[in-house]
A protein has these predicted regions:
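Generic hydrophobic transmembrane alpha-helix motif, especially the helices
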Residues: 176-232, 405, 454-495, 499-503
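Transmembrane alpha-helices
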Residues: 52-61, 262-294, 427-436, 521-553, ...
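Transmembrane alpha-helix signature in integral membrane proteins
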Residues: 48-56, 132-163, 224, 269, ...
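C-terminal transmembrane helix and the adjacent membrane-cytosol boundary/short C-terminal tail
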Residues: 320-361, 485-488, 499, 542, ...
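Membrane-cytosol interface at the C-terminal ends of specific transmembrane alpha-helices
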Residues: 215-255, 476-526, 539-544
Length: 663
């Protein structure tokens, strides 16, 4: 007998005649390579090695700082030890022999690392005292001050978020307010707040001590100076995330079930906290090592002040030990923040059960940014028509008048003219640095395994040290402050983007989109970026006044513009000693900075995500595909017979032209 024919699988339905799919573009292949790289760097061992490599690179850069600065380290150390001593060749030779500078930076760094492995951080080049006890003592003081400042920041953030919490818990959604008061508070420089509190509360009223560090009463004013601006910024970030949390389905179901508004508000805070915890960890490190100005004003022997003095005097053992302590603190704080965030979210990150909290929101008020912008423009234009360098010693520290609306400074120069002319360079550089930081933060935030260690390491570097490192590599010039600030300004934005990206990847709609066949480029372009970029852009605008102030503040170290340049930071520093006699000379540039902060926050309200744009384009594409195409009817053929193939073709075309998420 003949063998039976083998059974065959059912015949596949005939494919519709659709055009061939185009070859993958360069953008698609780049997205695929990015996804593969992101999967590769998820290995924990590579993350640890990457973090160790960054810390070693930072310590090596600090070890090369005296040689990068193109100055003789022996001369700097000699001046720091005794300013009156003549820098003769014999004196410089003695210093080189004592410190072993002739051996070179590589040998010195190896000796310091070898001693560190034995628990010996070396001796100070200036005082000769052991480094480790002084660094540990300064770190303890800074941690205590940071704890008080964080308590003030949390209370301030709660006050800023009180209105959104109250409205959201009662289902009263309105257009978002600009939050100008919080923005003005966040835009105030810390050293100005510290000077005002020390002068008014500490000296004039005598309520609290203004100098020293001897007990809890001495901690109140410094904690207020550091905590108020940080709390205002943290509160604005939290208030920006609350409307999306209250609009999720669980909040609607809880309200329909009859849960109290207090419980709904508490769960909304729990939903928003994981996205802000990485930035909270950055605040911890920044308040510990970056509070140099506040520690100088209140005479606090903290780690920031110790690091600044060591960087200025090029005391390498103290500088390296202080920086290493900040790097370790940043690693611990960053790890705890990410661990607590994952603990608060629970298994939803693995199950993909989150709901996207970044949705289209009602448009913000347009009148407020217009008013703030016109006021700032009026101040700048009024100052540009005046002379910022004209000296009049007979008109020193005059109060505001018709001739001088903002008064005069200690040299008789018009304050309004200096504010207006300083706005040209300060605002232009601040906008450029903020744009670069936003771009770098978003791009690095897409690879959290790489950017996480870099964020912790960069955030541990005080701005002063970053300025000195950049000046040593690129040299001192008008754009050196911009390079230094841009080198560290991307870190909080990258941390924010990474936290949002982690939550967005665990959302239900993204899991469904991938299951329906969406590729990495489609997911990145139409799902991830629209959810991450708008809140990070608003965060960048919130930091715009701080960037402007940081640019001007680095001019004090000789790294940028020098007097008589009308930089806003220079205006504050020059007039700060006369704040008690002529407060208008300090309040004028501070008020302009606060106005810039209010303008940035009110303008940030218009940066809203539009997730529905893609769906609208899909609907328009389907409508175009379903329209009957004009066809030529052959002679002698009825028109009704020609319509049927057109309808069938249009329906097939609509099914083929739909994107992958609608199959």
């Amino acid at each position: 007998m003949d063998r039976p024919a083998p059974s065959h699988s059912p015949a596949r339905p005939a494919r519709s005649h659709s055009p061939a799919r185009p070859a993958p573009s360069s953008y698609r292949s780049a997205a695929v390579r990015l996804v593969r790289f992101m999967r590769f760097v998820r290995l924990p061992g590579l993350t640890v090695l990457w973090r160790a490599a960054l810390a070693a690179l930072l310590l090596c850069g600090i070890g090369l700082l005296p040689w990068l600065s193109r100055t003789d380290p022996a001369l700097t150390v000699l001046k720091a030890r005794s300013a009156e001593r003549e820098p003769t060749a014999e004196a410089l030779g003695v210093v080189r022999d004592q410190l072993g500078l002739d051996a070179g930076p590589v040998t010195l760094l190896g000796q310091w690392l070898g001693g560190l492995a034995r628990g010996d951080a070396g001796e100070s080049w200036i005082s000769g005292a052991p480094v480790l006890p002084s660094v540990v003592q300064a770190l303890g003081i800074s941690l205590l001050l940071m704890a008080g400042a964080m308590a003030v920041a949390l209370v301030t953030a709660g006050a800023v978020c009180a209105r959104p919490l109250w409205l959201g818990s009662r289902r009263r959604f309105r257009r978002p307010r600009a939050g100008g008061a919080a923005a003005m508070l966040a835009a105030l420089p810390e050293f100005l707040t510290a000077s005002v509190l020390a002068t008014v509360v500490g000296v004039q009223l005598g309520w609290l001590p203004a100098l020293g560090w001897y007990g809890p009463r001495w901690m109140v004013l410094p904690a207020l100076s550091l905590g108020l601006p940080a709390g205002a910024l943290l509160g604005r970030l939290l208030a920006d995330a609350l409307p999306g949390a209250f609009g999720e389905p669980w909040a609607l179901a809880a309200a329909a079930r009859g849960l109290t508004g207090r419980r709904i508000a508490r769960q909304a805070l729990r939903r928003c906290f994981p996205g802000l915890l990485p930035n909270l960890g950055l605040f911890v490190v920044g308040l510990t090592g970056g509070s140099v100005a506040v520690e100088q004003i209140f005479d606090i022997p903290g780690l920031g002040r110790l690091t600044l003095q060591a960087a200025t005097a090029q005391d390498l053992p103290v500088l390296q030990a202080g920086t290493l302590a900040l790097v370790l603190l940043a690693a611990v704080a960053g790890g705890l923040a990410r661990g607590v965030a994952q603990l608060m979210l629970g298994p939803v990150l693995r199950d993909g059960a989150l709901q996207s909290s970044h949705r289209p929101s009602p448009p913000a008020h347009r009148a407020q940014p217009l008013v703030y912008g016109l006021l700032l423009l009026g101040v700048v234009v009024s100052g540009l028509i005046r002379d910022p360098l004209g000296l009049d010693t007979a008109a020193r520290l005059q109060s505001p008048s018709w001739a001088h609306p903002f008064g005069t400074d200690a040299l008789g120069r018009d304050v309004l003219a200096r504010v207006g002319h300083g706005a040209l360079t300060t605002l232009a550089l601040a906008l450029a640095v903020t744009a670069v930081a936003l771009l770098a933060g978003v791009l690095l935030g897409l690879v959290p395994r790489v950017s996480g260690a870099a964020v912790d390491t960069v955030n541990a570097v005080p701005p002063v040290l970053a300025g000195l490192l950049v000046a040593g590599i690129a040299g001192s010039g008008p754009y050196t402050p911009a390079l230094a600030v841009a080198a560290v300004a991307w870190a909080p934005l990258a941390a924010h983007a990474s936290a949002l990206l982690e939550q967005e990847r665990a959302t239900t709609h993204l899991v469904v989109t991938r299951a329906l066949g969406a590729g990495p480029l489609y997911v990145l372009r139409y799902e991830l970026l629209p959810a991450v970029v708008p809140p990070v852009a608003r965060h960048a605008l919130l930091r715009l006044p701080g960037v402007a102030l940081a640019l001007a503040a680095l001019g004090f170290l000789g790294l940028g513009a020098q007097p008589p340049s009308p930089e806003w930071g220079l205006l504050l520093s020059e007039n700060l000693p006369y704040a008690e006699r002529a407060p208008w000379a300090v309040l004028a540039p501070a008020a302009v900075l606060a106005l810039l902060g209010a303008l940035a926050v009110s303008a940030a309200g218009g940066v809203r995500g539009r997730r529905a744009v893609r769906r609208g384009s899909v609907r328009r594409g389907r409508a175009r595909a379903q329209r009957p195409e004009p066809s030529t009817v052959p002679a002698g053929r009825p028109e009704t017979e020609a319509r049927e193939p057109a309808k069938a073709g249009s329906s097939a075309g609509s099914s083929n032209s739909a994107p992958k998420d609608s199959r």
